Swiss-Prot record:
GO cellular component terms, A-Z: chloroplast thylakoid membrane; photosystem I
Family from the record: Belongs to the PsaI family.
Topology versus the membrane: Single-pass membrane protein
Keyword Chloroplast: yes
Source organism superkingdom: Eukaryota
Protein name in the entry: Photosystem I reaction center subunit VIII
4Fe-4S among keywords: no
SUPFAM superfamilies assigned: Subunit VIII of photosystem I reaction centre, PsaI (SSF81540)
NCBIfam families linked to this entry: PRK11877.1, PS_I_psaI
UniProt-listed HAMAP family: PSI_PsaI
Chain ranges passing through the membrane: 10-30
Single Gene Ontology BP annotation: photosynthesis
Amino acid sequence: MIASYLPSILVPLVGLVFPAIAMASLFLYIEQEEIS
C-alpha cells in the first residue's frame, strides 16, 4: 500500500523542493562571490 502512495509524494517533492534548494544554494553562492 505504501508503494502506491509513494509517487504522489515523491513527484511534488522532487518537482518543487529540489528546485527551491537549487535556487537558494545558487543565490547564496552568487551573493558570496559578490561580497568577497
